[in-house]
Amino acid sequence: MTDRSSRLSRALKAYDLRGRVGDDLDDDLLFALGWGTVRTMRARHGTAGVVIGADMRPDSLGFARALARGVAAAGGAPTLLGLCSTDQLYFASGRSGLPGLMVTASHNPSGWNGIKVCGPHAAGISRAGGLDAIADSALDAPPDPAAGDPAAAAEPRPDPDAARELAVGYAETIRAQTGITGLRRPLTVIADCGNGMAGKLLPEVFGTAALAAPAPLDVRGMYTELDGTFPNHPANPLDPANLVDVQAAVVDSGADLGLAFDGDADRCFVIDETGRATSASAIGALVARREIARARAAGEDTPVVLHNLITSRAVPETIRAAGGRPVRTPVGHSGIKQLMAEHRAVFACEHSAHFYFRDFSGADSGMLAACHVIAALAETGGTLSALLADLDPYAGSGEINSTVADPAAALARFRDAARAGTFGAGTVDELDGVTLTGADFWANVRPSNTEPLVRFNCETPDAARTAALTADVLALVRADDRP
């Protein structure tokens, strides 16, 4: 196996490429992937143009340049946007109709990097849908002509006009789709950017005079300096330890809510006025209600909203109550994007705080979701906790991972027990792993795409019952099967 091939095999994941800088990713591999992207996109879509963005990690701009050189070497036309968030890259792809490459490792720690790939119009791409083809084509790429030449490796430069147009167009779209320029009452928001790309977005979206009327929106940023070494805390809001600072700031300042973005700012977690981290399902239900209302106001009878199968049952209940039609999906970025296009869905939400919008080219945007929450809160005279109370009535387990020797055997044990009624009466389906759905509860066990483990989630009406169901299922899944 060649060095390029071995690096690719380590970096290629289910939905993107990700690895350690130096060990897995270097300029040569990024050059080859740019070359492979053009060859693949030209063959599949007849396009040779590619938009390329980079996050704030120390190697990201250099990697973006290597991608651009590879695109050009394959006869393509790269547009290098420079520093941007992942959802800005999706916006640029959607607006231009070109495929996109985003250099980012999202919430991974310092020392990691990667590439998120989208097709024309920000379409999702899976392994089978194009990632494998790009990787295979990359193996045939010539060497990077800039190798060993620092001056050549500093080229090409970002296009300042394209970057400026992106920032303005993105901000205008966020404002127009959420109505944050016309808030009914003043609000104070604490936004923890985690030294990630949200630090660039805050002044672009909120830092204009237009947001001062008719009611002021006071957005106070934390850790806004772009620094891919993450000196304050990892930009991973999935870990509760990384929410402590913004939670304290919200309570100490008496703010109305807090926001916590991940490194590439495509996800945003929301903190209520008490400092409590809100459920991504509750936020998804709130945004779904607003997107359904927008679509119905535009004449759509029964707007479709997608939700993955491990979001709270409050999500489909809210969708139906708002006049929409819920569609349940497997977990996974590229699959949801494809299903959004098939169903012409107005919105989609995942338990992981990925929120997708039809009017944002079907792509996910943490900032767009955050602004929906701000606008929804401003329409009330109350608190965020009160606004979300009826959208978060159930007790969920959260996702619990179990490392097992044989994931397929673990799933089979759960499937057999569920069908036998061991955990209560219900129906069993295999949309993604195995799900048992009862009259007032559900439980799901599904395999990881990349590791020898299974993931468990469940939800019931109360915490005690959820704890009991969790213990029973995990005991079965883990029984006699530890590696």
Give the residues covered by each predicted segment:
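Short glycine-rich phosphate-binding loop at a beta-alpha junction
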Residues: 46-55, 188-190, 303-309, 346
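Gly/Ser/Thr-enriched, mixed-charge loops and adjacent short helices
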Residues: 113-253
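Phosphate-binding and adjacent anionic-ligand microenvironments
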Residues: 257, 297-483
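A short, gly/pro- and small-residue-rich
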Residues: 111-140, 271-287, 360-371, 377
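N-terminal small/polar loop signature for handling phosphorylated ligands or for N-terminal nucleophile
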Residues: 39, 49-112, 204-271
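Proline/glycine-rich low-complexity loops and linkers
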Residues: 129-172, 176, 273-351, 355-357
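An N-terminal, well-structured beta->alpha segment
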Residues: 1-67, 73-74, 163-186
